[in-house]
Amino acid sequence: MALPVTSDNFDEEVLQSEVPVLVDFWAEWCGPCKMIGPLVDAVASDTEGSAKVGKVDVDSQQERARTFNIQSLPTIAFFKGGEVVETMIGTMGVTVDVLKEKLAALA
C-alpha cells in the first residue's frame, strides 16, 4: 500500500530518499484518481525496498500541491535525489508496468 505523505514526513520520505520515489497527487472527490489508486498501491507492493510510493491528498496538503504546481489530478511525480524528474498527468498511459518501468529507470 502506498505511504500517506504529509507535510510532516514529505522531506524525509520523498526529498531525502535514497531510492526513487513515485508520488501520487490525488483527491477524494477525483474520479480518475480513484481509478488509478489501486494501480499505485500495486506498484507500492511490487517495488517495496527498491523504491518508495507515496500519496499526497491535495485537499489536506494544499501547500505541498502548490509547491509542486499541481494543477490537474491525478498527477504522478517521479522523484530522484529530491528533485522531480518526470510527471504523468491524468490516467492516459498509467499502468502498473509503466509505473514500475519508470521507477526502475531511475534506480
Model region roles, listed by residue range:
Residues L22, V40, R64, P74-M88:
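A short, hydrophobic beta-strand/beta-hairpin element that forms part of a small beta-sheet core
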Residues V58-A65:
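Structural microenvironment flanking redox-active thiols in thiol-disulfide oxidoreductases
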Residues E18-V19, F25-W29, S72:
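Short pre-active-site segment immediately N-terminal to redox-active cysteine/selenocysteine motifs
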Residues E18-P20, G37-V56:
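Conserved helix-turn-beta segment immediately C-terminal to the redox Cys motif
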Residues L3-V21, Q62:
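A short beta-strand-turn-helix
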